[in-house]
Amino acid sequence: MSTDLVGTLAKQQPSSTRLQRRPNTALPFCDATLLPEPILYDTTVYIDVLHGKLSDHLKREIARLEPWHCSVAESEMTYLCGRLDPAHYGTGHVVRQIASIVDYWPPNRVLIPDRAIWREAAILTGILSRLQHARDEDRGRTMNDALIFLSALQHGCTVLSRNVRDFDLLMQLVPAGKAVFYRI
């Protein structure tokens, strides 16, 4: 990816009309199919693992794969460790659960967005904010999704996510990027 701002902007020429989420029938869901490889997990996967919400099919698929992870998903999860009230009786348990996930990641399987990815993600976030008339408080979430999506693209991965809305819009803006969705 280029670190040239003008070149990056030139690649993004979306219309000025609001993007529409496509119907589920037009999107890749992994309800009963094998997951593509290589696969990069979105934060929703870890959250759903912690809550025990994954289907048996998806559990089998996850057990079969050697996934990629992203430092952005790690930051989204570990943010909770600081956000939760340390005096609350359940905080220690949640922190241990999060630590058990991120400490398990092999360092050589963690993608870290580089400068070019950050630049492209910022541009995509701005475009989505403009086209979707997004609230300022949604910018951080959108930026994180764009960072994960573009990191996957840079490394030839497909994102696995439950977040259909945001990753569908990202795929519409950057058709070379790939995501596959699951339901809980």
PLM segments and residue spans:
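Short, hinge-like loop/turn segments at secondary-structure boundaries
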Residues: 85-89, 128-129, 177-179
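Acidic, PIN/NYN-like endoribonuclease modules and their adjacent C-terminal/linker elements
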Residues: 1-33, 149-184
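Short, flexible, basic/aromatic active-site loop/helix in glycosyltransferases
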Residues: 97-107
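Alpha-helix capping/helix-boundary segments
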Residues: 45-46, 117, 148, 165-167
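Conserved beta-strand scaffold positions in the cores of enzyme catalytic domains, especially
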Residues: 67, 110-111, 178-183
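Active-site neighborhoods of divalent-metal-dependent phosphate/nucleic-acid chemistry enzymes
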Residues: 2-10, 18-19, 24, 79-84, ...
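Short, well-structured N-terminal submotif of metal-dependent ribonuclease cores
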Residues: 1-76, 80-99
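Phosphate- and divalent-cation-binding pockets in alpha/beta enzyme and binding domains
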Residues: 76, 120, 169
